[in-house]
Swiss-Prot record:
Cited InterPro entries: SKP1, SKP1-like, SKP1-like_dim_sf, SKP1/BTB/POZ_sf, Skp1_comp_dimer, Skp1_comp_POZ
Protein name: SKP1-like protein 17
Pathway annotation: Protein modification; protein ubiquitination
Gene transcribed to yield this protein: ASK17
GO cellular component: nucleus; SCF ubiquitin ligase complex
Phylogenetic lineage: Eukaryota, Viridiplantae, Streptophyta, Embryophyta, Tracheophyta
Species of origin: Arabidopsis thaliana
Note: This protein was called 'Meidos' in memory of one of the murdered sons of the mythological 'Medea', as MEIDOS is repressed by MEDEA.
Tissue specificity field: Mainly detected in the siliques.
C-alpha cells in the first residue's frame, strides 16, 4: 500500500513531493491536510527550498520516532553539527513556522551549546546586538555582576 503524497512548494518555488506521514511531522502542514487544504501543492511562503529540504530530511528520519528514541540522540547531534549558524537561525524560524517541535528544540539547544562559552562581545556579534551602554555603565554592570563575567 503506497502512502498518499503531499506536495510542498517553497518560497523560491522549489517543489517537494513527500509522503503524508512525513508531511504530518510539520504540525502546520498536518492541520492543512486535516482541513482538506492539501489537494494541490501547499505553498510555504516563509521557507526557502534549501531550508525546507533540511526540514524534510529531519522529518523523514523522525517519521517513526516513537519506536527508536535512543537512535535519534546520535543522529540529531550529527544532523546539526555541521550546519552553520546562519542556517541554524533560518531553520529555527522555519521549524517554528511549520511547528516541528522536536527540530525547534534541537536547534535551540544547538545554539545554546554554541553560545555557552562565548564572551558578551562574541554573543553581541553573533546576534547582531548593538552595545548601547556607555563605557562607564558597562564597567558598573561588570562590577555589580562580576560572577557572570568570569
Amino acid at each position: 500500500m503506497s502512502s498518499k503524497k503531499i506536495v510542498l512548494t517553497s518560497s523560491d518555488d522549489e517543489c517537494f513531493e513527500i509522503d503524508e506521514a512525513v508531511a504530518r511531522k510539520m504540525q502546520m502542514v498536518a492541520h492543512m491536510i486535516d482541513d482538506d487544504c492539501a489537494d494541490k501543492a501547499i505553498r510555504l511562503q516563509n521557507v526557502t527550498g534549501k531550508i525546507l529540504a533540511i526540514i524534510i530530511e529531519y522529518c523523514k528520519k523522525h517519521v517513526d520516532d516513537v519506536e527508536a528514541k535512543n537512535e535519534f540522540v546520535t543522529w540529531d547531534a550529527e544532523f546539526v553539527k555541521n550546519i552553520d549558524m546562519d542556517t541554524l537561525f533560518k531553520l529555527l524560524d522555519a521549524a517554528d513556522y511549520l511547528i516541528v517541535i522536536g527540530l525547534k528544540n534541537l536547534i535551540a539547544q544547538a545554539i545554546a551549546d554554541y553560545t555557552a562559552d562565548k564572551t558578551v562581545n562574541e554573543i553581541r556579534e553573533l546576534f547582531n546586538i548593538e552595545n548601547d551602554y556607555t563605557p562607564e555603565e558597562e564597567e558598573e554592570l561588570r562590577k555589580k555582576n562580576e560572577w557572570a563575567f568570569n
